[in-house]
């Protein structure tokens, strides 16, 4: 019931508001997956490949964008978006809302629209895993992490697009349960499709790729648990976790080429075991710096650490 100047202007039954709209009967169909033509791996040096990866739009620095708004959150930032002398984006940011409290709040996010057409379930799984991992790597307590979803989708009236949406939502449930991270909020932006005409008058339709952005927020119990991406002289660099033949739809495969591969699949049990061990080591104070491996793989991750700290690294992957 809504009144204005004591005059009733709206009286809507709550049962009707929540239950009055009839349920829709919608159909889904498995989408036709366009097989990407196999790219021939070009013979080039590791340096050339690294330069191509670093200059790709999804990896190159976005500093010119971030610094245009209040990216330091009213002077409460303790881990800022850009880290080190080289000013490189880290995995997460952290703010300290209360001056006299050791706790801080870490925030991160992840999105992998490039995987959506191949496997929307795994796309959502990768997004949740990365958003979660970024907070763990930054020092957050694994038992105090929550996530938010932001679905940016094309027309769900189309059975194949609705199927992709259903698969992504299913993954949200499965991985939120596996990681014990509740969805505390979210938003949907549907029907992002353009219908019009080209310069010849022919009708065209352009749809955005199915996209799911996962944001994560977590509590860091002590400031001493916060990590940085800038190693110090003499630090030993270790790689945690396993690498599998999962280069399909990766930045590397798009730019440089690939042999037969598949898209990344998150094994939550293996991942959580790695994250728990990292968290234990960090609480013991033996982690000086850390970075989560993301777009571009190990090569980009260690390069970010080197640029941020302006130090050289000796790497052995044998």
Residue positions per predicted region:
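Glycine/proline-enriched, intrinsically flexible loops and inter-domain linkers
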Residues: 1-318
